[in-house]
Amino acid sequence: MKLLIIKIDTSYEVEDALGVFATDNLKALGIESRKRSDFEQAGWLHDSTVVEMDDIKDLPKDTYFYAYFDEEADKDELVEKFQAKLEELKSYGLNTGEGKITTSYIEDQDWNTAWQKYYHVIDFSRHLAIVPEWEDYQPAFSDQQLIKLDPGLAFGTGNHKTTQLAMMGIERAMVKPMSVVDVGTGSGILAIAASKLGATNVLATDISDESMTAAKQNSALNNLTNIKVQKTSLLAGVEGKFDIIVANILAEILLDLIPQMDAHLNKDGQVIFSGIDYLQLPKIKKSLDENNFKIDLTMKQGRWIGLAITRKEK
């Protein structure tokens, strides 16, 4: 099987908007971005990362955005839609960069390994670092926990702002050993983070077979036995209640999750949301209010919003 790659020479300012457009509107199989700043700040200046000299000449002026599609997808139609989206973003006064779009094809199995040289250690916080399984890394702090990860094609490598917002929320909420459910687990990164931070038992749910496989493999890679993986839509069929519900998924899906939360949240439990575009925040707030929840903390990175949520006091 081959994958169609659409590459856009663009700007970090519209990176997130292109990502949402590619996944939501065009149903991309995967997205990726490479920014010059990633290498300048976390590449050759980071002891744990090696950037080969041959790669430097290929770095973007600003940002390369990649979207991956099935080889049978209509290449010309997709290019036209991306061009129209760039024009729309430019009309808002946003910097879209050069806007050059190129296409190519790659063998699926080649993609699974070729991209690895662009994915390196992420020193997320004093307590957590995300380490690809092919890299050797020593903790920066004596109490720093390492999340070993082989994300493959599953969403959730730790690079994206939405994943980082969700991890920030988990760190803040985990004040004692707690039970956690990670809804829409993807690669399992948030479930693993919760376990590493002291969760006593963790449930990871997803509707995707690929995510189920990735989450199980990544849990095993971290030698974790307290993470259970369940294939289901959101919390359907999930038994029991949890101290923390975490979900890094699109706002439209969060709206379906909100009515299910009360039945699965312990007294004084907390909910962590991420994956919310700031334009979607008003309807999330409205639904939370209608379901007896309130926002305790709003976190923001770029256009993405993370929320810490609890029940309203009666």
Swiss-Prot record:
The residues forming a coiled coil are: none
Gene Ontology CC entries for this record: cytoplasm
Q: Does the keyword DNA-binding apply?
A: no
Q: What are the recorded GO MF terms, alphabetically? A: protein-lysine N-methyltransferase activity
The record's catalysed reaction(s) read: L-lysyl-[protein] + 3 S-adenosyl-L-methionine = N(6),N(6),N(6)-trimethyl-L-lysyl-[protein] + 3 S-adenosyl-L-homocysteine + 3 H(+)
Keyword annotations of the record:
Cytoplasm, Methyltransferase, S-adenosyl-L-methionine, Transferase
Does this UniProt record's set of keywords contain Disulfide bond? Answer: no
Q: What is its main location?
A: cytoplasm
List the EC numbers from the record.
2.1.1.-
Which residues hold S-adenosyl-L-methionine?
A: T163, G184, D206, N248
Q: Which HAMAP family would you find in this protein's record?
A: Methyltr_PrmA
What does this chain do? Methylates ribosomal protein L11.
Instruction: Spell out the protein name for this chain.
Output: Ribosomal protein L11 methyltransferase
The source organism is Lactobacillus acidophilus (strain ATCC 700396 / NCK56 / N2 / NCFM)
Q: What is the lineage of its organism?
A: Bacteria, Bacillati, Bacillota, Bacilli, Lactobacillales
Gene that this sequence comes from:
prmA
